[in-house]
Regions:
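Charged, low-complexity intrinsically disordered regions
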Residues: 1-77
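Class I S-adenosyl-L-methionine
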Residues: 47-187
Length: 187
């Protein structure tokens, strides 16, 4: 990079080029439809019930979200709006510590753990099973992850708008599960 010059970043999907030189989605020879019929960012609605319910319901939502993500990845395609709705219900592992301690967990926790790690006779949902980086990250996140409820996110958007933000590009401030993007006001 030349000193004093800012890099020019792509602004549209058409400007994005893979480093390997392989074709971009939508061009002849492309393998997936990364930008083809992409449904866009999922807009979270009140009726989605994001983060609602007891621990067991959140646990089931998390495992279903991971199962859905793995299917979409395996099929090398974009998620449908219905699949996006399922994945939007992922709340992280911060409040689900019982999952990592099989000695204090009930049947639903042990079943979910077996599904994630592949000890139920099926392929694991988490890469590498109980030795993989995803399981290690999950364990660590149970003490360090913090879920931001939709009501808090909506209130934060109200404050940002009050201070003059009227739309544009934003980054997911939590680097998390997408609630800030999913609850971004349309206007």
């Amino acid at each position: 990079m030349v000193r004093g010059k800012k890099p020019v970043l792509p602004q549209t999907p058409a400007e994005v080029r893979p480093l390997s030189g392989s074709p971009v989605a939508g061009e002849p020879g492309a393998q997936n439809q990364l930008f083809g019929d992409a449904p866009g960012n999922y807009e979270i609605k009140a009726e989605d019930g994001i983060g609602e319910g007891p621990e067991g319901q959140k646990l089931r939502a998390n495992t279903e979200a991971i199962r859905t993500l793995r299917r979409v990845q395996a099929e090398n395609r974009n998620a449908t709006p219905e699949e996006q709705a399922t994945m939007a219900k992922f709340v992280g592992w911060g409040g689900l510590r019982k999952l990592i301690d099989p000695n204090t967990a009930g049947k639903q926790w042990l079943d979910a753990r077996a599904e994630l790690l592949g000890t139920n006779g099926q392929p694991p949902l988490l890469d590498g099973g109980d030795k993989g980086a995803e399981w290690i990250a999950l364990q660590r996140s149970t003490t360090a992850a913090h879920y931001t409820a939709p009501e808090v996110v909506t209130a934060m958007w109200d404050v940002v708008r009050h201070f003059g933000f009227a739309g544009g590009r934003v980054l997911e401030p939590t680097s998390g599960i997408g609630n800030f993007i999913g609850l971004q006001p349309r206007d």
